[in-house]
């Protein structure tokens, strides 16, 4: 038996229930993971509330890290004892142990803690997709990122700067201005006080930006 957090109906935090469940037999292409850290994401609240409907009853959570306790018979590239992390479906990371597809796991390099891994997988993969797939940036591009002080925004600002970009970020408070600057924004606009379009055009000398995230 293992403990998991389940929802049987949609609602607020009160619908989260700790359940003891029996895990099924391990499929040949999956592994059993002992959870060490869980990433909390805003999408978890959407699944819980029903804003993003999921079949009920359901587990919750899309991101975690841990240690492999058992491997399926077809697994060749992972071993018992490996430290791994994941970010994405299937839902159910709020659990002491869980079974998860091996091909969706990332083996953790030395020096990356469980806590760091569980906090950046989903957000980091989102930033990778934005910078390399949605609009592949080039060095010296000036880019605009809304919500620059959020979890995704902080990673985005650091990553884009490492690629040689100039980063303009928008935030909603003075406190968040400080956070965005700390993470590399060249210009931070508090949209509750300032017109970000005017600020962007002034900063770019009327050229604008090739992409807005």
Can you name each region flagged by the protein language model?
Residues 12-13, 21-65:
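N-terminal glycine-rich beta->alpha transition that marks the start or flank
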Residues 27, 79-80, 138:
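Residue-level recognition of short, solvent-exposed, well-ordered loop/turn junctions
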Residues 65-90:
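A glycine-/small-residue-rich N-terminal strand-loop-strand element
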Residues 85, 144, 189, 210-213:
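N-terminal Rossmann-like NAD(P) cofactor-binding module of classical short-chain dehydrogenase/reductase
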Residues 86-147:
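NAD(P)H dinucleotide-binding glycine-rich loop of Rossmann-like/cofactor-binding domains
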Residues 121-194, 198-199:
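Mid-domain Rossmann-like dinucleotide-binding core that forms the NAD(H)/NADP(H) cofactor-binding site
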Residues 202-211:
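A glycine-rich helix->loop->beta "capping" turn
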